[in-house]
Amino acid sequence: MILSRSVSVLHLCGVSSSAPSKLLSQRFKVSFALAYGSSVSFRLSSLNRSDRKWVRGFASATEAEVEKKGNDTFFADHTVSWKSLGLSDNVSIALRDSGFDRPSLTQAVCIPSILSGKDVIVAAETGSGKTHGYLAPIIDQLTNTALDSEVTNREERPFPLKNISLILCPNVMLCEQVVRMVNGLVDEDGNPLLRVEAVCGSQGWPDRLPDIIVSTPAALLNNIEPKRNRRLEFLRCVKYVVFDEADMLLCGSFQNQIIRLINMLRFDEKQVSRLAKSNLGRPMEIDASVPQIDLENEDDAEFDEGSISEEEDEEEEEEYLDDIAQMPSVEAEAGSDTKKGWRRVRKIYTRSKQYIFIAATLPVNGKKTAGGILKHMFQDAVWVSGNFLHRNSPRLKQKWVEVTVDSQVDALIEAVKNNNNTNTERTMVFANTVEAVEAVADILEKASIQCYRYHKNHKLDERANILADFRETGGVFVCTDAAARGVDVPNVSHVIQADFASSAVDFLHRIGRTARAGQYGTVTSLYTEANRDLVEAIREAVKMGQPVETAFSRKRGFRNKVKKRAFLKAEEAEEPQAVRY
C-alpha cells in the first residue's frame, strides 16, 4: 500500500478574519495508522470477462444484468422482489414499509446465499446495501424460529435455548447504526420484528437475551469471559455470526480478539457435533445439509469450560497465528483433501453456526491479509463480489485539484461554496487529523460557512448528536476518517478531501460516503506534490477501468504493473467459483 507521507498544508493556528484565504507558515505532520501491514494487490487473470477464472476469489454470475439495465447499476432487475429472493411476507412488507421497494444487486445475490445456510463473504462497494443484505435473511430466519418457540420459555429464562444472532462491529457508532436499522424493520403494529440490544460503550449485558446482539469484540469478551454459565449458554445460542467491516476486524488490534471469539464459537460447534453423535442425553437436531468444517484435533487437550487463563489464551492465539503463517498457497486446488502446511491432524465436525463476513474493501493477495485469512479459514464459503468493488462508481464524478501552500485554502472554500447552495445540501470534508479538522473548520467559518466538527476528541454521545443533526438538517460536515468507514448518511452529494487520503483503502472509504444507494455524487480531491504518486496511481487505475486495489502496492513500479495487467494473462489455478453480480 502506497502511503502519502506528506506534511499537511493545513495548519493548527487560527486564520485572521481579514485574510481567510492566506495560510500561515506553520505546518504539521500527519500521523498515519497503517491499516494493512503488507502489500496487497489482487492478480487479474484478464480484462476479458470470458477469460476470468479467479478474480479475488469470485466468479462471474450475473454481470450481464448491469449491461442489460443500462445506467441502473444499483438495483436488481425489476422482476426481482424481496419475496422472490426467499424472504417471508413479514420481512418483505417491513422492508417495503421502510422505503426499500426493490432489492439492490448486492442484496439480490447475498440474501439467497445467506438463506442457504452456508458461510458467506460479501465484498461489495460502499453504499450497495450490504447491511440490509445480511439483516433481512437473518431476521427472516430468526423470526421463523421464534414463531416455533413458546413465549413462556422466552420470558422465564434469561438465556433460553433459542437461536440468536451476534453482529460484531469495530466501534460503538457502527453498533448503534446497526441497532437503528434492525429497529427500523417493524410489523403491521409498528413494533420491531425482533428484539435487538447493543453491548458496547456504556451499555452492559442485557437482563434478558435478545434475538440479536450487536457488539464490539472487546465489549463482548469482557461480558462473556468472566462468567462461565453466561459464556457457555450464549455460545450455544448463537446461530448466526456477522463480522461487519471484516477487513478491519481481521487486522491490527482487533485480530487477536476476533481469533479468540472464532475459537470459542468453533469449539462450541465441536461440542454440539460430539453431543449429536453420541447417544447421551436427548438427541439434538443437526441440519445434515449444512456443510462441515475443519477444526483442530483437541482430544488430547480439552477446552477448559471454566475461566480461561491468559497463558491459555495466548497459546491458542500463537497456535492460530502459526497456522496462518503455514497456510497453503492460493494456487492450491479447491476442495483438495491435502491440507499443505498444517502441522496438526484435523477432524471434521458437523456445522451448527453460520459465519457471515461483510466488507467494502477486502484485499486477498498475501496469506495474512483479511481476504487471505478468510480464504483459508472458510474454504467452502460463498463469496459475493460487487461489480464496483475497489472501483470507481459510474454514478460518481471526480474532480482532481493539485494545490500549493498558497492556493489550498482558496480551492477548499471554492469547492465547498460550489456545492453548498442550499441548507439541505450535505457536504463531507475530510482531513487527516483532529488538528486538521479544527483548522479546516476555522477556515470555513471565517469564510462565513457554518460547519459541523466530528473527530475522536468529542465524546461518543456528542458525536452521535452531531451525526444525527447532520443527517437531519444537512450542511457541511468536517471530519476525520472516523466518519469514513461504515457510517451511513443519506443524500451526501459532495465529498471533499481537504487532506488527501493516506492510502488507497482510506480513499475508497471516503469517496464511498456519496453516490450511495443508486444516487449520484461528486468527489473533489485536493492534493499536493507530496501526494502525487498515490493520486496518479489511483487516477490511472480509474482511467483504465482497473480496481483501485492496484494502488495498494508499496512498490514504486506498480504503475507499470497496472498497464501490463491490461495485456497479460496471469497463470493461476482455478479456484472454487462463487457469486459475482
From Swiss-Prot:
Gene3D superfamilies reported in the protein's UniProt record: P-loop containing nucleotide triphosphate hydrolases (3.40.50.300)
Short sequence motif named Q motif, residue ranges: 80-108
GO cellular component: chloroplast
Residue stretches making up the Helicase C-terminal domain: 408-566
Domain notes: The Q motif is unique to and characteristic of the DEAD box family of RNA helicases and controls ATP binding and hydrolysis.
Similarity remark: Belongs to the DEAD box helicase family.
Protein name in UniProt: DEAD-box ATP-dependent RNA helicase 22
Gene giving rise to this polypeptide: RH22
